[in-house]
């Protein structure tokens, strides 16, 4: 998953036309601060930023560090900032940044491990905290299936599309100000299970989210939803959770 290169798919590329790729370089054992390093890479109309990075690693500088895996916008591994905007490296086409340069930086609001690789441990801790999985009452798995209607699935379908790419954390203006803010993706995934008819931990999860500033720190700017590559609306999930929590405080049965 880390630092792979696939030189065999780039051998037929000619250097007739190039574009400048400016990549953040940072070695914590040597550098006091991140710096940008420029590379002239081949330009092809069908290339994305990840292709250009793979070219650099395979042909110019094998020390460049970044994460990637599927190259298909599914795994969420290759999140980075491209010309200041949170993007998946496998979905950001070079043609959209002509004539260049294309400035590739690590995602904002995360500690840098090295070059484009960031430390995501805080996100993983927050994700575990909201319990994004189905919790049932029974002590053992019961017989049969837990069937759902199309209408029941549609309630949470959008939020289930999250791929944990963390672009929403890079875009969120609250995360750098309130580091303890649970954040968009974690709340969206919590909402996904809140709306799942098979789940039985709705009130427990809601108390977890509302018992601190987990949701109330959100200022509803909506940048998280704007940058999501899968069309998830974390801002909507946060507002829905706020509304449900408010009903629970004002009405004896949570508005039911």
Q: For the regions a protein language model found, what residue spans apply to each?
A:
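Short, Lys/Arg-enriched N-terminal segments with co-localized hydrophobic residues
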Residues: 3-14
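Short, structured protein-protein interaction patches enriched in aromatics and acidic/basic residues
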Residues: 70-79
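A cross-kingdom feature strongest in bacterial/archaeal respiratory oxidoreductases
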Residues: 41, 65-68
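Eukaryote-biased recognition of intrinsically disordered, low-complexity regulatory segments
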Residues: 16-38
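Short, contiguous acidic and Ser/Thr-rich linear segments
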Residues: 36-48
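Glycine-rich phosphate/adenylate-binding loop and adjacent beta-alpha elements
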Residues: 82-104
């Amino acid at each position: 998953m880390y630092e792979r290169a696939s030189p065999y798919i780039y051998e037929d590329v000619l250097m007739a036309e190039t574009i400048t790729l400016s990549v953040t370089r940072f070695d914590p054992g040597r550098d006091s601060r991140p710096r940008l390093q420029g590379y002239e890479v081949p330009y092809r109309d069908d290339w994305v930023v990840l292709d250009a990075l793979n070219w650099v690693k395979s042909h110019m500088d094998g020390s460049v560090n970044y994460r990637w895996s599927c190259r298909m916008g599914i795994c969420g591994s290759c999140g980075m900032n491209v010309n200041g905007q949170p993007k998946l490296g496998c979905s950001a086409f070079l043609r959209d940044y002509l004539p260049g340069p294309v400035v590739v930086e690590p995602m904002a609001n995360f500690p840098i491990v090295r070059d484009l690789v960031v430390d995501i441990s805080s996100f993983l801790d927050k994700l575990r905290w909201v319990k994004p999985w189905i919790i049932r009452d029974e002590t053992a798995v019961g017989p049969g299936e837990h069937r759902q209607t199309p209408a029941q699935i549609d309630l949470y379908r959008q939020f289930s599309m999250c791929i944990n790419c963390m672009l929403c954390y890079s875009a969120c203006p609250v995360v750098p100000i309130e580091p303890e803010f649970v954040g968009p993706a974690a709340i969206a995934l919590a909402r996904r299970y809140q709306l799942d008819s098979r789940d039985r931990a709705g009130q427990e999860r809601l108390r977890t989210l509302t018992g601190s500033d987990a949701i109330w720190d959100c200022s509803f700017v909506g940048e998280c939803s704007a940058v999501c590559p899968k069309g998830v609306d974390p801002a909507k999930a946060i507002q829905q959770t706020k509304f449900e929590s408010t009903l629970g405080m004002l009405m004896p049965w949570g508005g039911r």
